[in-house]
């Protein structure tokens, strides 16, 4: 009888031994976290600047001028260029907070699944999603507090009279208001609640101006990705769900994360760190997740708030 030499390595099916080996390896857990593409921080999309902190706090400049402190002059041939100073804004300091929790995953929960990895995926996703929700809530509150420019809607997006719904007017006027500041802001993002998002898709004026013969129409996709060249982001974590924000995400601010290289943690692309800890006395695993971060708003003028967009 023919046989292979050397013998092939033994293979493992989706049993408890396989899952245990997976959870004990941070590299494998990290690779698995990359598959959770539907989990994403809204905060990281609105505050795109990134800073690293090692001392538990981050120092940043608020409302930094976008021009130098000297008027540009005509320079004669052969003359030296005049020096100008790069003005700085008001210094701000934010303390890093560690947001985290853990859940218990028993061996019985794993083995009683027809596909044991489902139990691990569900537990990991819930831990990561809970951290996302908390960090997003804190970041959105920070943005909402910092934004001071606001105006009432021209016509609420869910107005009982369809003709009085004016989301496009609100958006275009908001973009104009930011540009009128002449501070270099370029609006690129619209942030709305799920209800406002729905009425944005239902609006007749916007629907009539969109391309008709295309498969990216909201009637097919259930999504509206851009309006007036703004990326539309839907989140239930707005501090006031009846309002909408127009922001310049490149200028608004950022997130400062702290990494301490603690052993056993798998770090995902989301900046969430996850660690699996075996509890032999309980025949279970602790799945522990955390993110050490703080949001900071550098340019309050890079945000514009529209009030009363929905009831």
Predicted segments, located by residue:
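Intrinsically disordered or highly flexible coil/loop and linker segments, enriched in small
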Residues: 39-45, 52, 133-140, 184, ...
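Helix N-cap / beta->alpha transition motif
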Residues: 104-108, 191-196, 248, 299
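Sequence/fold signature of self-assembling virion shell proteins
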Residues: 2-30, 203-311
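Assembly/oligomerization interface modules of large self-assembling protein complexes
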Residues: 31-101
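Extended, solvent-exposed, turn-rich assembly/linker loops in the middle of proteins
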Residues: 147-220
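Short loop/turn segments at secondary-structure transitions that flank enzyme active sites
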Residues: 109, 196-198, 238, 293
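Long, contiguous amphipathic alpha-helices that act as assembly "spine/axial" helices in icosahedral shell
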Residues: 86-151, 183, 190, 279-294
